[in-house]
Amino acid sequence: MMKGQIAGLMKQAQQMQENMKKMQEQLSQIEVEGVSGAGLVKVVMTCKNDVKRVSIDPSLLAEGEDKELLEDLVAAAFNDAVRKAEATTQEKMGTVTSGLGGMASMLPPGFKLPF
């Protein structure tokens, strides 16, 4: 590989690193909502997995309501939010990694970037 090609790859890698840092900052601001029980339980979190809010419909807190059901609904809403955050992160970070260009072919087979 020629010296100029290496310098070009280094510059491209540095630019991609800067783009990834900016994207990670943006992801910490993007909120997704996980829902379960037909909307009775909602979890709002960022794409960096910081939970912002948990909403539970008052009907689930009524006397005689099943505690285990409520726990299951909270867990399901949380898992739904995590899946949505992961999907959003993959989508947004895909725009950054599409800039790899020729560098993508230099990565080992099955190599996954850390995001």
UniProtKB/Swiss-Prot annotation:
Subcellular location: Cytoplasm, Nucleoid
InterPro entries: YbaB-like_sf (IPR036894), YbaB/EbfC (IPR004401)
Keyword DNA-binding: yes
Keywords: Cytoplasm, DNA-binding
GO CC, one annotated term: bacterial nucleoid
Broad class of where this protein is predominantly found: cytoplasm
One Pfam short name: YbaB_DNA_bd
SUPFAM superfamilies: YbaB-like
Quaternary state and interactors: Homodimer.
Summary of the function given for this chain in its UniProt record: Binds to DNA and alters its conformation. May be involved in regulation of gene expression, nucleoid organization and DNA protection.
Entry protein name: Nucleoid-associated protein RSc1192
Species name: Ralstonia nicotianae (strain ATCC BAA-1114 / GMI1000) (Ralstonia solanacearum)
